[in-house]
Regions:
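Conserved donor-nucleotide/metal-binding helix-loop-beta segment in metal-dependent transferases, i.e.
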Residues: 93-117
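Short, polar loop motifs at secondary-structure junctions
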Residues: 45-52
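Conserved alpha/beta core of the MobA/IspD/sugar-nucleotide pyrophosphorylase nucleotidyltransferase superfamily
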Residues: 139-188
């Protein structure tokens, strides 16, 4: 299985994926966390940024111009089975990733955070779901309903849900910086 980090240009917080948390770009932090699990044959950043470059990160360009569904459909064709991860989850930790991936039994799988929100960018997609997702995308570009109806859903408890905190505003970024565990990066 691969891990695919989805990155598109943010309207609310432009350049957020390269903003630093614990002295490193948010995107590098997520990438490193996924690599650290040892669960993935490859970690890939799937980016709509035309000129994104980060040392140590494998970056593939997302050629789609539509919604998240379009990017996921394209990713299924390119990567097959993968854990989809949002590029704005700087608090993601390897324990949560490992526990989630170990729940995977071949059925598409998505996390539901402690507030009841389905996380389409903390989910496992595979070719089994491609046809249904493609057909659904012809009628609706809303991925939440599709995931709710077609995926095996795993409830993430409140403590673990904190690692799924996403950054969309400067206030979110400051909050993430405040609660991030920077002890592992102190020597950098």
């Amino acid at each position: 299985m691969k891990a695919v980090i989805f990155v598109k240009q943010s309207q609310r917080l432009p350049g957020k994926h390269l903003m630093t948390i614990c002295g490193e770009p948010m995107l590098s932090r997520i990438y490193r966390t996924l690599e650290h699990t040892g669960l993935f044959e490859t970690v890939v950043v799937y980016s709509k940024y035309p000129d994104l470059a980060l040392d140590g990160c494998l970056i593939e360009r997302d050629p789609t111009t539509g919604t998240l569904i379009d990017s996921i459909l394209d990713s299924i064709v390119k990567f097959g089975e993968f854990l989809a991860v949002g590029g704005d989850l700087p608090l993601l930790n390897s324990e949560v990733v490992s526990e989630f991936v170990l729940e995977y039994d071949g059925r598409p799988l998505a996390a539901v955070n402690s507030e009841g929100t389905i996380e389409p960018l903390f989910a496992i997609y595979n070719r089994r779901i491609y046809g249904e997702l493609l057909e659904s995308s012809k009628h609706s570009k809303q991925i939440f309903t599709f995931v709710k109806e077609r995926f095996h859903l795993i409830q993430i408890n409140e403590e673990r849900s904190r690692s799924l905190f996403n950054v969309n505003t400067l206030e979110d970024l400051e909050k993430a910086r405040t609660i991030a565990d920077c002890s592992h990066t102190a020597s950098r």
